[in-house]
């Protein structure tokens, strides 16, 4: 970290410094803003009635940030990395949205706190395992880490990260890990019952569950190879979209039958 902070920003001919810097800053800022609606022990910074929509909107904002971070340097590999993330997003976003909608439908609310409270009898992860698994894969994808680090692949000289240096590189790297942490924290109220648990206060259970999810995600990203983009896109549209669509229908039918 001290080395990155002390490094001079890279200057490229014809680079659009404004768009480049805007894209770099957008990624960590969007990650922090996404966490505002996550209840920690029953309390959220912003308890929005459309918290799930807010989280998803901040995640989609990252698309624009990374594309601008790839476009701004006016370099071929960086631009390829930016477009790779957009293509990756087009593959994972629809299954991810269906996974989010499944939890919201079961709780009959878009408020994240209401979704956590609706799981006192049984965690959504238990009877909606497809949505839970797809959501966790989506977290790795929008963090472009592990098997989904294709936008920053070695075959394109680190892609969207390749031309950044100094504080800009630090911001982008921080943004990736902030998104991973925010995604892990959001999984707790959506699928793991929030801060509910015996013997400990709600904030402690929220922290323990978040750390457990984060540890699992880090284990996966350290051990799985990069997924080829064409195979991932095909699998997402041919397999994940139908599966998550069926998963949405399960809570929808249960709600209608009440």
Which residues are covered by each model-predicted region?
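Alpha-helical transmembrane segments of multi-pass membrane proteins predominantly involved
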Residues: 1-258
């Amino acid at each position: 970290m001290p080395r990155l902070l002390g490094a001079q920003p890279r200057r490229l001919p014809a680079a659009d410094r404004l768009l480049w810097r805007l894209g770099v800053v957008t990624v960590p800022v969007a990650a922090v803003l996404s966490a505002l609606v996550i209840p920690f022990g029953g309390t959220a910074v912003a308890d929005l009635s459309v918290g799930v929509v807010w989280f998803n909107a901040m995640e989609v904002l990252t698309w624009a940030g990374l594309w601008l971070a790839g476009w701004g340097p006016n370099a071929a590999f960086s631009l390829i990395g930016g477009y790779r993330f957009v293509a990756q997003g087009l593959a994972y976003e629809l299954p991810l949205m269906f996974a989010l909608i499944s939890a919201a439908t079961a709780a009959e609310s878009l408020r994240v706190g209401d979704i956590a409270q609706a799981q006192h009898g049984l965690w959504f992860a238990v009877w909606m395992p497809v949505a839970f698994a797809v959501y966790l894969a989506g977290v790795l994808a929008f963090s472009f880490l592990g098997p989904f680090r294709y936008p920053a692949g070695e075959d394109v000289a680190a892609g969207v990260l390749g031309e950044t240096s100094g504080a800009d590189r630090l911001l982008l790297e921080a943004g990736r890990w902030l998104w991973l942490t925010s995604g892990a924290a959001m999984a707790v109220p959506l699928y793991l019952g929030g801060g509910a648990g015996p013997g400990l206060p709600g904030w402690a259970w929220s922290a323990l569950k978040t750390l457990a999810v984060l540890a699992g995600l880090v284990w996966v990203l350290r051990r799985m190879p990069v997924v080829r983009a064409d195979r991932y896109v095909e699998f997402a549209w041919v397999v994940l979209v139908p599966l998550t669509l069926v998963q949405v229908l399960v809570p929808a039918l249960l709600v209608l039958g009440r």
